[in-house]
Amino acid sequence: MRDMMGMMKQAKELQAKMKAMQDEIATMEASASSGGGLVTITLSGKGTLSALKIDPSLMKEEEVEILEDLIIAAHNDAKAKLEAAMAEKTQSLTAGLPIPPGFKLPF
């Protein structure tokens, strides 16, 4: 019975820590550039695009395809940075817990 109470307490503590971590992640931002800084993108912790800066030199009709590629590259880089930061925070929170390898938490 004591073990069950202890597990319930641990689960409640973990839930509170996860909520705090989710709140912290929501306030994070990740920025990335492509094309040597010609395009810069910033994503919020929730993954929404919060800023996009484009160098005026790319605002030419013949540069549209290059601009599209640079936006995609910057977005993908910013997303990867955000996911890495989230994984790092999640790992520190779940250290020592018996979670199977490859198990993805729902946030």
From Swiss-Prot:
It is found in: Cytoplasm, Nucleoid. InterPro entries: YbaB-like_sf, YbaB/EbfC. It comes from Brucella anthropi (strain ATCC 49188 / DSM 6882 / CCUG 24695 / JCM 21032 / LMG 3331 / NBRC 15819 / NCTC 12168 / Alc 37) (Ochrobactrum anthropi). Keywords: Cytoplasm, DNA-binding. Signal peptide: none annotated. This is Nucleoid-associated protein Oant_0022. The keyword Membrane does not apply. Belongs to the YbaB/EbfC family. One of its GO terms (cellular component) is cytosol. Homodimer. Coiled coil: none annotated. GO terms for molecular function: DNA binding. Binds to DNA and alters its conformation. May be involved in regulation of gene expression, nucleoid organization and DNA protection.
